[in-house]
């Protein structure tokens, strides 16, 4: 359904992604950010489902932050995530921003590691950012950087998450309020990565509800019925 894409980055390197093109020409884009596993078949299938759920009206690009590497086991995933520098991620995101052009209106979504990069991308997109969905991802804690955010944020938070814990979320809420930024937090009685069917702690009911909330949020930002 989608196609592999390669774009040039401003440092002379290339970046990879998986793209689905809107049925009719559109400047609306959704940047999708993978979990620590990499841009695997699950993320591609999720991107395809998002494309359908957004009525094929939005261009979808699942961005590969690992430059082609995909992990099959946790040790590899941990190593790949640790090896990813914020600088390289910024270069990759900027490459795709240049690729879609100055007129593009872009929302972001991601899970786990990708949830954090969903927020970082929205910060990087500045006035082109439409909205940010972050599933159990680490929010930006630097208020000087956070004040530049121009997108509303939907945070999907499982309250059993030991990494993105209550302290992290409460601090993020307080920072967003102090900066007069819009944050919507959907809390679930679930654990980290509850939305991924391959996770032993997958919660189908919570995942379905969270997906519906994410779609309502994204459709409102894209102006889709």
Describe each PLM feature range.
Residues 3-101, 198:
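Serine-hydrolase catalytic machinery in alpha/beta-hydrolase-like enzymes
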Residues 128-138:
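A conserved short beta-strand
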Residues 101-111:
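Alpha/beta-hydrolase fold nucleophile elbow
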Residues 110-114, 118:
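Gly/Ala-rich beta-loop-alpha elbow adjacent to hydrolase catalytic centers
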Residues 160-164:
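Acidic catalytic loop of the alpha/beta-hydrolase fold
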Residues 45-46, 165-175:
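Short alpha-helix in the alpha/beta-hydrolase fold that links the catalytic acid
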Residues 149, 155-157:
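Short beta-strand/loop motif that positions the catalytic acidic residue
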Residues 179-225:
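C-terminal catalytic histidine-bearing segment of alpha/beta-hydrolase fold enzymes
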